[in-house]
């Protein structure tokens, strides 16, 4: 197995710029393997629990869409692991470029979009904690969810179709080598659109959590001295969303800008290009980590999910009865504490 590949000429240097692939062929496949098993177990469990919970709030609808997106992303990991470790033949690399890599980014931006919607929902819960969802709002949330999936699918499908060139050799170093001329143009357009999606949701998260922090501080000032410690502890939980967003998605999108410049323009020397490559791969792994961190959001912020999980862990046979109890509460008017209060 070749550990070092010749890539490109470094600006201002006639020697070839080489890159050590031991990290990407050994370390990252191991890290993705860990994510695959942890993510598959936790998200399969989350999927089972959410199938037992009725979609009685916008929050739960968005969480259900998130767990589906995460599970789809996780299912792409084995193909990436085999491809990066050079354990598969040329057709596997072609399949990764044409299908699984597209699905990976497709699900990434779906998750980003739903985290933005969940953030807006948490802000509304902070300012109007006793407002309940009505059927009209639930229908709107479902329609919005379908539109997000449809929009991202329509963006991603051409990337699959236009990755249609036959590889010149068995070892395809870049997926761009397999794209048609228009495929490269479309890929660039999609990259710009995805950047816009991220930055819009980035602003949503920043603005909403600034307002949430102000509201929680006002609430703390009003209730200071009353001794409502449990409420203060609950309030802190809402910040898990911004923590997941910043850990998983922000580093990649900040690293992506200089990395793209290093691929399209001669503005960095060889050492800088290699550093940017490793930074990009590291931050891409962090985006994958999101699939393992989202279950913490479900557990800490969704009481129905938390109760069902605890019941399942205590006694697996009681999970069905817990689900029936939840459904009975919903028929009787719902559990006012179904979501973690602000």
Swiss-Prot record:
The modification Phosphoserine is found at residues 55, 57. SUPFAM superfamilies: Family A G protein-coupled receptor-like (SSF81321). It is a multi-pass membrane protein. GO terms for cellular component: membrane; plasma membrane. Glycans are attached at residues 6, 13. The chain crosses the membrane at residues 28-50, 62-82, 98-118, 143-162, 186-207, 234-259, 279-298. Residues 317-342 are annotated as: Disordered. The keyword Transmembrane helix applies. It is found in: Cell membrane. Residues 333-342 have a biased composition (Acidic residues). GO terms for molecular function: G protein-coupled ADP receptor activity. ADP binds at residues 93, 97, 105, 156-159, 175-179, 187, 191, 256-259, 263, 280. Residues 1-27, 83-97, 163-185, 260-278 are extracellular. Receptor for ADP and ATP coupled to G-proteins that inhibit the adenylyl cyclase second messenger system. Required for normal platelet aggregation and blood coagulation. The transmembrane domain is composed of seven transmembrane helices; most of these are not strictly perpendicular to the plane of the membrane, but are tilted and/or kinked. Agonist binding promotes a conformation change in the extracellular loops that leads to an inward movement of the transmembrane helices. Antagonists can bind to an overlapping site, but block the inward movement of the transmembrane helices. Belongs to the G-protein coupled receptor 1 family. This is P2Y purinoceptor 12. It comes from Macaca fascicularis.
């Amino acid at each position: 197995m070749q550990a070092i590949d010749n890539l490109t000429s470094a600006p201002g240097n006639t020697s070839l710029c080489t890159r050590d692939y031991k990290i990407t062929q050994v370390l990252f496949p191991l890290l993705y393997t860990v994510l695959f098993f942890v993510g598959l177990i936790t998200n399969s469990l989350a999927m089972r629990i959410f199938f037992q919970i009725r979609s009685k709030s916008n929050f739960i609808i968005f969480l259900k869409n998130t767990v589906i997106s995460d599970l789809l992303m996780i299912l792409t990991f084995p193909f990436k692991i085999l491809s990066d470790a050079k354990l598969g033949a040329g057709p596997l690399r072609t399949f990764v470029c044409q299908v699984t890599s597209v699905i990976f980014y497709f699900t990434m931006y779906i998750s980003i979009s739903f985290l933005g919607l969940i953030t807006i929902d948490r802000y509304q819960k902070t300012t109007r904690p006793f407002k309940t969802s009505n059927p009209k709002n639930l229908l709107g949330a479902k329609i919005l969810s379908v539109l997000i999936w449809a929009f991202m699918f329509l963006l991603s499908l051409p990337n699959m179709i236009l990755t249609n060139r036959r590889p010149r050799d068995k070892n395809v170093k870049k997926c761009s080598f397999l794209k048609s001329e228009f495929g490269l143009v479309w890929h660039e357009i999609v990259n710009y659109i995805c950047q816009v999606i991220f930055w819009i949701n980035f602003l949503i998260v920043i603005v909403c959590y600034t307002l949430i922090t102000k509201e929680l501080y006002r609430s703390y000032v009003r209730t200071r001295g009353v001794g409502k410690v449990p409420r203060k502890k609950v309030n802190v939980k809402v910040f898990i969303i911004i923590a997941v967003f910043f850990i998983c998605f922000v580093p990649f999108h900040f690293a992506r800008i200089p990395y793209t410049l290093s691929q399209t323009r001669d503005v960095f020397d060889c050492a800088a290009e290699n550093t940017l490559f490793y930074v990009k791969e590291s931050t891409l792994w962090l985006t994958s980590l999101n699939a393992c961190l989202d279950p913490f959001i479900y557990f800490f912020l969704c009481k129905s999910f938390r109760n069902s999980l605890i019941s399942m862990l205590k006694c697996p046979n009681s999970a069905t009865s817990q689900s029936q109890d939840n459904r009975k509460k919903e028929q009787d008017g719902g559990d006012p504490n179904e979501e973690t209060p602000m």
